[in-house]
C-alpha cells in the first residue's frame, strides 16, 4: 500500500487501530501483565527485546490482519525492528494493516490542570526515518486532568502545532489530548476540549485532514461534531483504563468512533500460552473490539 491507498483504507475501511506503543516507562508494567516479572531481564536492552518478542507474536499471529485491524501504532524501537525477517512496517502493510509511529517523548509536570508534551528536538529526523520505512502517520499524547480552560486551550494548541509539523512531512497525525477518566470534572473537560478542537479544525488549510484519538466521553455523542467535521479523517478512542467489556460497551454508544485500544486488546495475553492459545485469546479480543467499532 502506498500513502494514498493507506489514506483510503483508514477513511473507508472497517476495523480498529491496535495501540502497540508502550514506551520505556510503561514497558515493565506491560511485561508484568504479559506474565514476565521485572527480574526476568538484566538491563534495558533485554527488557526491550522481551517487549519486542511480545509485539512480534501479536503482529505475526494469523488473526492479526487487515480484515479487522485497520492500523497499528508502534513504539520507535518496534518500528526499527523486524518480524519474521521483515521490517515491522513492511510486515504490517503486507497484512493490510496501516502503520503509525508514537512520536511524543513523554509528559511535562502538571500545570493548569494539564500535562503538555515534552519537547521533541529530534522530531524531524524521526519523521524522515518513519516515512522512509513506509509509516503512514503518527500519534502524540498529552493529558487533561481537570477542566481548566487555559490549560485545555494550551494542550489543544500544542497538539495542532506538532500535527502541522507531521503534515508538512507528508504524514497523517493522530492528535491525542487524553482526558483522564478519573477526573472529577470529566464531562466539562469533554465539552471544553471539543470546543477548542473545533476552533483549530476550522483554521486548517484547504482540504487538510487530521485524526483524533480521544477518551470515551461521559455523554455519548459528545464528539459527533468532530466525527462529522470535514477536516477530520477519523476519530478513534483510547480505552483509558477501562477493562475490555466496559471499553467496548462505551465505544458502541458513540457513532462513527472506532477503537484504538492497548490494554483492552492485550489484557488476556500471557507469555506461557501456546501459539494456539495465544491466537485464540487475541482473536477473541480483536472480534469484540472490531464489533464495537462498527457502530
Task: Give names to the regions the model predicted.
Residues 138-212:
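Eukaryote-skewed repeat-based solenoidal scaffolds used as protein-protein interaction platforms
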Residues 1-136, 144-146, 189, 196-214, ...:
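Alpha/beta catalytic barrel-like cores
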